[in-house]
């Protein structure tokens, strides 16, 4: 949600301006979330949390998931309907053969003009070239990416003194309505403590032939 609000309200640009004592607000106008349509693809734990946050902003929330959760207070619709109605689209699904490039030339064409897209899940959910084409066509109001499908060897590294060989990533950084961060959505003190704790618990369980938590069959 922080990324969506930043992209929508240009907070990062406002901060850069005020650091230089430029208090001009031209070009920083955003849009209200109230009563807008939020679309959530993937309703696992993180998707569910995002739905609750959207409801807090009094948004109309639509969801798509091949395995709907009947206990969740949200309206499930087809992917096509969600894409065609969402003013703000947030991706929260795992990367599988079925979800790879779920955002592509075809699905982008279904989206509303001026829609906002945020991906904090997996980079491979988005066809980067299709995204660039959509940005060039001014399809999006804004795009927030905490993940990128070719992030290996780039994200978590200091490449500030290097020539970036990834033309698509370099192109994405040129768009004024695109915000990219380096896969840091998980990076909080509490999350890192939880990861360490669960890793040690699983190591102990494996050593002692106990049941592993979150075992992937």
Show the residue positions of the predicted features.
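Short amphipathic alpha-helical segments and helix-helix/interface helices
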Residues: 1, 51, 104-108, 131-132, ...
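Generic alpha-helical structural context detector
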Residues: 1-9, 16, 84, 91, ...
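Phosphate-binding beta-alpha-beta segment of Rossmann-like dinucleotide-binding domains, i.e.
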Residues: 1-37, 49-52
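Rossmann-like dinucleotide/phosphate-binding beta-alpha-beta segment
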Residues: 26-113
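Rossmann-like dinucleotide-binding domain for NAD(H)/NADP(H)
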Residues: 114, 124-217
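Glycine-rich nucleotide-phosphate-binding loops and adjacent flexible coil segments
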Residues: 118
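Active-site beta-alpha turn of Rossmann-fold NAD(P)-dependent dehydrogenases/reductases
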Residues: 121
